[in-house]
Amino acid sequence: MSYNPYDNVLATVENAANILGYKPAEYEAVKYPERELSVSVPVRMDDGSVKVFKGYRVQHSTVRGPAKGGIRYHQNVNLDEVKALSAWMTFKCAVADIPYGGGKGGVVVDPTTLSDGEKQRLTRRFTSMISPIIGPDKDIPAPDVGTNAEVMGWIMDTYSMLNGHSTPAVVTGKPIALGGSEGRNEATGRGIMLNTLYICQKLGIDIKAATVTIQGMGNVGSVTAKLLNKEGAKIVAVSDVSGGIYNGNGLNIHAILEYLSVKGNLLSGYNEDGMKRISNEELLTLDTTILIPAALENQINKDNADKIKAKVIVEGANGPTTIEADEILDKKGVVLVPDILANSGGVIVSYFEWVQNLQSFEWTEEEVNSKLARKMSKAFENVYGIAKEKNVSLRTGAYLIALKSVVDTTKLRGIWP
């Protein structure tokens, strides 16, 4: 039986609702996305042929504000995954206390097989097909797996052309020249770094004496590695789609990042003295202080959770741990900082970008990072506090805060008509 990430969401919501003592009628609407859009996207390829790609945009909730969430290009995108990711965005925005609901989008495509022209034509056609339901006050996309600032620029331009005026606030994570925010590119990784420092402080772990392993060296993983390395942590293992590398004495993160900055380079081609090659699976079970899964969903599951030796897990990816794995880790005493808290730095700074666009105003990188640290610290303390008070995991604590916020707002708004 295949794993359905949306079942994970429903189980977590039910658990939080039971602890909060909610009646089913109070949270029933939260269990279902408000809107699911499926589109078939025809694209003329460079060889003159036409390929049709499947695309989705799901708006889970707009109770607290416009839907907010990324667009991913990946060959394994499916509707259940997009639904789960959109729900996680609803709860992530509520935990961070920013005025958004949750949305997510995706196209079933391996972006590495597309030329730049094909990717641009796909993006523009997909944008035109979802344009009726997106907009600065409706639904604001952002980058995700397989997309980046350049793709956001194409979305912004297409939407602006369709509407007859420049609309930078329709997406976040744009290039700076198109209204992007300083600090946005590093925001998710910076948030993970901050949450790692916060939890280490609570547990009495000296970050300079800690060993760290990071699964995934895309934007999130590489920024996290860079910033934790700067804080003095010893990063002993990292990985990407081509596999992982390990050095018990600490990897040369600066050299790795320089190597990976060259387009097309993967870790399988990297070498340094004292390192050995490991698989992604081996990386997850290394004896380490802190494990940061920053790749895709469902990486830590019932099959490997019992083998995990890390004392702390900080979730860089969305949904990297299944419900069954959560229970196993909890029994083992592993402290886990959940995705909807740990990786919310990206959406917090996306909110800052949106605000700057709407006000035609610019903040410096120092201002953005300072505001992010304040928001993140408050969110962490809120989650840590309620988890201690209710004697529950940090994930459950985060969902208690998020669900209460969404349900309270729903009660204030009422259900129309």
Model-found features: residue ranges?
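Flexible, glycine/charged-enriched surface loops at secondary-structure junctions
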Residues: 23-29, 97, 135-143, 166-169, ...
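Glycine-rich phosphate/diphosphate-binding loop of Rossmann-like nucleotide-binding domains
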Residues: 175, 180-285
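Adenosine-phosphate binding glycine-rich loop
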Residues: 2-4, 199, 308-417
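Glycine-rich, N-terminal phosphate-binding loop and its surrounding beta-alpha-beta segment
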Residues: 39-47, 52-111
